[in-house]
């Protein structure tokens, strides 16, 4: 058998390229975690999905009513089925076939649930959570109301600062989210934000959590995987 490393002088470096990339993302994530802690958030870095699931389940008390924000990240983790099997009431407004009136009730229930599960659009290296919403139930529930908030973000959502956070939201997250939702918006067609004034514009509420709000119990898990939009 031929030794491929003899054929290509960069073979080893090419093999290590993804490992090196992951190392850098982990360093950035860990720096963000330390900054979040300084800003009074409970924050933790975990390496993968299995560890993230375990941390989430360990932080949800027995019998807790659990609200779920509009988050692909939370669905990727696969914890909702487990929580239902454990007997938790789940407030999930993404359940197929829900009447519009029920969806509104569930969104309101997010504000008073025992535990609210969500992601965030961006986490800065300065320890801030940056979000843009269309309705505001997700951003609102992150700030005040639930007994506990668990925020989960992949390393792909770690950015340098607020400016980078909003640029990520406008240029990366929102075009994908609205296209996935099937909304007829300019960014869903072109992939670029034009700061539209469409009746269905998704960017209507912008919230920055600079520090953990008083009376709120917020846990932030940064996962060493690409998650969500």
What is each PLM-predicted segment?
Residues 14-18, 37-40, 88-91, 102-104, ...:
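N-terminal start-of-chain detector that recognizes signal peptides
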Residues 25-107, 112-117:
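N-terminal active-site beta-alpha-beta segment that forms phosphate/nucleotide-binding
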Residues 1, 25-32, 77-78, 84-89, ...:
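Unusually extended, aromatic-enriched hydrophobic runs near protein termini
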């Amino acid at each position: 058998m031929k030794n491929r490393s003899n054929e290509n002088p960069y073979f080893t470096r090419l093999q290590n390229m993804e490992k090196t990339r992951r190392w850098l993302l982990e360093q950035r994530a860990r720096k963000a975690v330390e900054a979040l802690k300084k800003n009074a958030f409970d924050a933790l870095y975990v390496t993968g999905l299995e560890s993230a699931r375990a941390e989430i389940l360990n932080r949800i008390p027995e019998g807790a009513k659990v609200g779920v924000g509009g988050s692909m990240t939370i669905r990727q983790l696969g914890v909702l089925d487990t929580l239902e099997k454990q007997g938790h009431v789940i407030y999930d407004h993404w359940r197929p076939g829900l009447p519009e009136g029920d969806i509104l009730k569930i969104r309101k229930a997010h504000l008073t649930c025992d535990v609210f599960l969500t992601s965030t659009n961006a986490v800065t290296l300065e320890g801030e959570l940056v979000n843009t919403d269309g309705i505001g139930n997700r951003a609102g529930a992150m700030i005040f109301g639930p007994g506990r908030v668990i925020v989960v973000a992949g390393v792909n959502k770690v950015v340098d600062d607020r400016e980078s956070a909003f640029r990520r939201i406008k240029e990366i997250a929102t075009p994908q989210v609205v296209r996935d939702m099937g909304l007829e918006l300019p960014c869903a067609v072109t992939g670029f934000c034009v700061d539209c004034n469409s009746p269905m514009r998704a960017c209507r509420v912008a919230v920055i959590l600079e520090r953990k709000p008083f009376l709120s119990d917020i846990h932030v898990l940064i996962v060493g995987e690409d998650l969500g939009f």
